[in-house]
Amino acid sequence: MQDRQKAQDYRALLLADTPLIDVRAPIEFEQGAMPGAINLPLMMDDERAAVGTCYKRQGADAALALGHRLVCGDIRQQRLEAWKAAYQRFPNGYLCCARGGQRSHIVQRWLQETGIDCPLIEGGYKALRQTAIQATWQLAQKPILLIGGCTGSGKTQLVRQQPNGVDLEGLARHRGSSFGRTLNPQLSQASFENKLAVELLKINARQTLKRWVLEDEGRTIGANHLPECLRERMAQAPIAVVEDPFALRLERLREEYFIRMHHDFTHAYGDEAGWQAYSEYLHHGLFAIRRRLGLQRFAELTDTLDRALAEQLSSGSTDGHMAWLVPLLNEYYDPMYRYQLEKKAANIVFRGTWQDVANWLKAQ
């Protein structure tokens, strides 16, 4: 343990996907955590709140004493068993609290009493978080190439195929549009940024990196927003635009939103509940842009969506969805993206089909 405890290289710890036994309270963990960390709190939220109030009113010694009274007996033993099991599962793991202070030291000492020497992160989560922020800023200074194109152009797939591609939407667990949510809930903003930083570090470590390849995104991806240092660099980056035939885009969207999402919902929740969740997902996506469509047009497209869902439920056919998807693209998504792209026209360095852009990227 001593070798692991000395002179910690935070970047190396993040690059290695080092298991972290995070002993902070659940509310702290939810607000921000490192990829792969598991939350096994020393104190639960209410216990931490009580200790914090005691600290403010009576000082550190009284707060520490209260903490020991709250976590004692069977509660202490149950949590100790959970930490022991976690260390046995991840013998190369580290304990982590907010700042490498009393909580991780207390858990470390209790484990030592059982014969387990588990190192802790000096500086705690805050030190790792600062390392992630600094890494993102530094790596965002490298050249960036954006992949642009209207909805359904296969941009994400193209980015994923590049050895230097960073799938921002995958990291954010959201595909960017009003229909972009996935079955996996989005991470907190800090956790998203931490995951992005680790991904950048890993890709940078695998190769001699000339530039990043990213999808042309807005300021936000669902509830997550891009780090400002990265967004500023993307705003100035050259863009390769995918221009595929409309019919091909429709087939990609059919596969992604009507076939795959239906499958994912029913696989997760069963046929009946999954169908209900899938239907609500499509309705929610349309409802989210009702004001931009205009209430009358929204009502018309909603009726068309209902008919398409009825047809899909009865026959399995997704053809009916084209009756609302086509006008949605023509009247809303395509004009919106083309307007945004026009403002960045000076940054466009290549236009072509998906395959043209893929070939162009290989030649760079």
From Swiss-Prot:
Effect after changing residue 97 to A: Reduces the level of geranylation but does not abolish it
EC number: 2.9.1.3
Classification via InterPro entries: Rhodanese-like_dom, Rhodanese-like_dom_sf, SelU
Binding site for (2E)-geranyl diphosphate: 149
Reactions performed catalytically: 5-methylaminomethyl-2-thiouridine(34) in tRNA + selenophosphate + (2E)-geranyl diphosphate + H2O + H(+) = 5-methylaminomethyl-2-selenouridine(34) in tRNA + (2E)-thiogeraniol + phosphate + diphosphate; 5-methylaminomethyl-2-thiouridine(34) in tRNA + (2E)-geranyl diphosphate = 5-methylaminomethyl-S-(2E)-geranyl-thiouridine(34) in tRNA + diphosphate; 5-methylaminomethyl-S-(2E)-geranyl-thiouridine(34) in tRNA + selenophosphate + H(+) = 5-methylaminomethyl-2-(Se-phospho)selenouridine(34) in tRNA + (2E)-thiogeraniol; 5-methylaminomethyl-2-(Se-phospho)selenouridine(34) in tRNA + H2O = 5-methylaminomethyl-2-selenouridine(34) in tRNA + phosphate
NCBIfam families, sorted: PRK11784.1-1, PRK11784.1-3, tRNA_sel_U_synt
Assembly, per entry: Monomer.
Role played: Involved in the post-transcriptional modification of the uridine at the wobble position (U34) of tRNA(Lys), tRNA(Glu) and tRNA(Gln). Catalyzes the conversion of 2-thiouridine (S2U-RNA) to 2-selenouridine (Se2U-RNA). Acts in a two-step process involving geranylation of 2-thiouridine (S2U) to S-geranyl-2-thiouridine (geS2U) and subsequent selenation of the latter derivative to 2-selenouridine (Se2U) in the tRNA chain.
Domain notes: Composed of a rhodanese domain and a P-loop domain, which probably binds geranyl diphosphate. The two activities are mechanistically different, but the rhodanese domain is important for both.
Name recorded for this polypeptide: tRNA 2-selenouridine synthase
